Amino acid sequence: MREKAYFHLPGLFEFYELYRMFLPLFREHREYFYDWCEIGSIYGAPADCIWGGGRAGFGENDPEEVLELMQEYGISARLTFSNSLLRQEHLSDRKCNALCRLFERNREPQNGVIIYSELLLEYIKEQYPGLYFVSSTTKVLTDFTQFEEEIRRKDFRYVVPDFRINKAFDKLNTLSQAEKDKVEFLCNECCWFGCRDRKACYETVSRKNLGENCPEHHCKAPDGARGYLFSKAMENPGFIGINDIRDIYLPMGFSNFKIEGRGLGSALILEFLLYYMTRSEYQIHVREKIYLDSMLDLF
């Protein structure tokens, strides 16, 4: 049994302005939020990071300001460096190395890297030993045996499996408590549950981040052209809602939950924060503090 759920939130660079408004609320008005939830980390990557993966980063905020905000609120910052196609010549990239140096400098709380490439893992372990590692969901670990092997690797503090493992309760319950503490479930994936192209989709993002000229990946999923809809994500067989977290996962001994959304708009990220962390009777208070006033026009 675990008492607290730790949410790992998207948009470290991409949604800096949103968090600059939300984090003071989370600290000063704790009564607005569920007492069983905390912020475990905020993750992301700025624009033009060749080590980036999963999504193309678009944050333009100054990394020192971003890190200063995280330090002020005692939140671990994670660099999303999950490019799966890195080669030796990419390891010398000045921008990505500078980010690692900066993020390694602060040890309380410790900052981390979400990673795919074994080459990059070994490089960062040697060059920036003060950073911890998260095994990226872009590895698409759908086989439970492979997932267990990943959990047992000492390199990783956390492992994010593919969302299709989320409800494999019989197998998940065979893990030891130490292993359960390393599992970080992806809660709100909108991708089609039967998708076979997930890895190819992520590889296209990796190629784009490397600046390669590559064809677009065209999603073949039913309703894929509609893009991300939170309502559709909630219907996904792998979706983890707040009742699931409180009534199933915490009692089973799991406590880490990742919210996706780096490539979405800030309005949708706010909806995630409201749904997963905010008591229903206070959601209007959070909206009013962040954007809603008597003169706001939508049409």
Please name every model-derived segment:
Residues M1-E150, F156-F299:
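Active-site pocket-lining/capping segments in soluble small-molecule metabolic enzymes
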